[in-house]
Amino acid sequence: QQDYTGWMDF
């Protein structure tokens, strides 16, 4: 899943 910024949500 990705975060709101586009980075991967760890």
From Swiss-Prot:
Point out residues bearing the modification Sulfotyrosine: 4
Q: Which domain of life is it from?
A: Eukaryota
Name the organs or tissues of expression: Expressed by the skin dorsal glands.
Instruction: List the protein's name.
Output: Caerulein
Which PROSITE patterns is this protein grouped with?
GASTRIN (PS00259)
Q: Identify the species of origin.
A: Litoria peronii (Emerald spotted tree frog)
- Carries keyword Disulfide bond? no
Phenylalanine amide: residues bearing it: 10
Q: Where is the signal peptide?
A: none
Keyword presence, Secreted: yes
